[in-house]
């Protein structure tokens, strides 16, 4: 499975769907989906019960596929790639105008 460049708390840019072009903060990461705050909001109807005698409608954020979001750096969608250094460190780097800059450490390789 491909490594995810998006983590909880990151700001992402939506590439496809009804909320295309919007930005939001990642609340949860699932296997190949992410839940973004205020994006892809669905209405859930709650049945009548003793706690809710009239029933209720609540808004929940539905998950988006990971391919439909891109990490937002400086309010622009950014493409990231993994670079392995001589010491075995895996780093997320981003391309910008021909140069690359470090964004986040992925992991340290042993050995």
From Swiss-Prot:
Record has Ribosomal protein as a keyword: yes
GO MF assignments: rRNA binding; structural constituent of ribosome
Function: One of two assembly initiator proteins, it binds directly to the 5'-end of the 23S rRNA, where it nucleates assembly of the 50S subunit.
GO CC list: ribonucleoprotein complex; ribosome
Pfam families assigned to the protein according to its UniProt record, in alphabetical order: KOW (PF00467), ribosomal_L24 (PF17136)
GO biological process, one term: translation
Family membership: Belongs to the universal ribosomal protein uL24 family.
Entry protein name: Large ribosomal subunit protein uL24
NCBIfam families: rplX_bact
Alphabetical keyword list: Ribonucleoprotein, Ribosomal protein, RNA-binding, rRNA-binding
SMART domains reported in the protein's UniProt record: KOW
Gene: rplX
Highest taxon listed in the record's lineage: Bacteria
Subunit structure: Part of the 50S ribosomal subunit.
